[in-house]
Structure formats: C-alpha cells, structure tokens
Amino acid sequence: MRLKYLRKKKKISQLKLALDLNMNQNSISRYETGTREADYATLIKFADYFNVSIDYLLERTDNPTFNK
C-alpha cells in the first residue's frame, strides 16, 4: 500500500493523519508496515484524504486519479 509514500509526500506525521481521520496512530503505523490490512471503509478514508483512487493506494495502478 502507498500509504507511507502519500503521507510523506504530503509532509504529515502519522499522528496528524491519525487525528485527521479519527484513528489510532498505532493503526496507521501497522497499515504502513503491512502488519495490518485495511478494511474497505478504511481504504475509502485514505483514498478520500489523499484524493487518489483505491487502486492507486493499493498499487494496482500507477495512475493516482479516478477513472472517469
């Protein structure tokens, strides 16, 4: 998942991301390291937050925009 890449590109901390999304910082860390998998609702939160498609977030495409 490109979560860490997107977070660093936006220059925000795990804590800021967690607070913005009403999540736990430990969960963000686990998603970034791959020790925890995000459910669909969480993937939507991340994709909406970073304004990318879920496919881009999950590295299924290199196109960050939504298919229209």
What are these language model-derived features?
Residues 9, 58-68:
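Short, charged recognition helix plus adjacent turn
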Residues 34, 45, 63:
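Alpha-helical DNA-recognition elements
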Residues 9, 35-38, 49:
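Helix-turn-helix/winged-helix DNA-binding modules
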Residues 2-20, 45:
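Short basic helix-loop element that most often maps to the first helix and adjoining turn
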